[in-house]
Regions:
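M16 family metallopeptidases and their MPP-like homologs
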Residues: 1-18, 27-75, 92-93, 104-130, ...
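Acidic/histidine-enriched alpha-helical segments
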Residues: 33-37, 78-96, 162, 181-194
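A common structural junction motif
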Residues: 72-81, 173-181
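An aromatic/glycine/proline-enriched structural segment found at the starts
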Residues: 117, 121, 125, 150, ...
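Short, charged, amphipathic alpha-helices and their helix-cap/turn boundaries
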Residues: 132-136
Length: 194
């Protein structure tokens, strides 16, 4: 999540999340969307302060097939330069629009007062116009390679899937996902008022 962003390139984790849903090596964005829809499933990737989350909703009878798509999204991202530029520009425009929101402005000011400007937690997950202008596609690939690791992953299942079925489906992760050490920095403490 945000905690692993370079302080000068805040928004990288968010762009990685968005890029993961922009197709795979074997599927264009439209083909991926259609494959998910054909299963009656929903897959989304979002960034929080301390995580990149892959959320999946599917019928239990489509669990294995849906997870195959999740694996494809996670292990075979497309990294299309045109999609990257489109998403980056979209995000910059969204940031510009958000400046007119009193709630958004208040939230940003509050975060800066609490954490201080040099603390990553005072930054918006989406980044800023300035930070996004510094981010290149290679920065996203670097974040992806060095920040997403099974050691820091957790899987939660709710629904009509047996433990044995879940273990069978997730077994492939052991061979596909390289376990790397990811050092999650401790954020600086928030400022306190006396």
């Amino acid at each position: 999540g945000l905690l692993l962003d370079d302080i000068n390139k805040v928004g990288s984790a968010n762009l990685v999340s968005r890029m993961l849903m922009q197709g795979t090596k074997n599927k264009t964005p439209l083909e991926l969307e259609q494959a998910i829809e054909d299963l009656g499933s929903n897959i989304s990737v979002v960034t929080t302060d301390d995580a990149v989350l892959i959320r999946v909703n599917c019928l239990s009878i489509k669990f294995a097939e849906t997870f195959n798509l999740v694996e494809e999204i996670l292990f075979e991202p497309r990294w299309d330069a045109k999609e990257f530029e489109r998403l980056k520009n979209e995000t910059i425009e969204s940031i510009k629009r958000s400046k007119t929101s009193a709630n958004n402005t208040a939230s940003m000011v509050f975060s800066k007062l609490i954490y201080g400007d040099d603390n990553i937690l005072s930054k918006s997950i989406t980044g800023s116009e300035q930070s996004l202008s510094l981010i290149a596609l290679d920065d996203l690939k670097n974040y992806y390679t060095h920040s997403l690791a099974p050691k820091n992953a957790s899987i939660t299942i709710a629904g009509n899937v047996s433990e044995d079925d879940a273990i069978d489906v997730f077994k492939s992760l052991e061979t596909k996902w390289n376990n790397i050490d990811v050092n999650i920095p401790q954020p600086k403490e928030a400022k306190t008022l006396s």
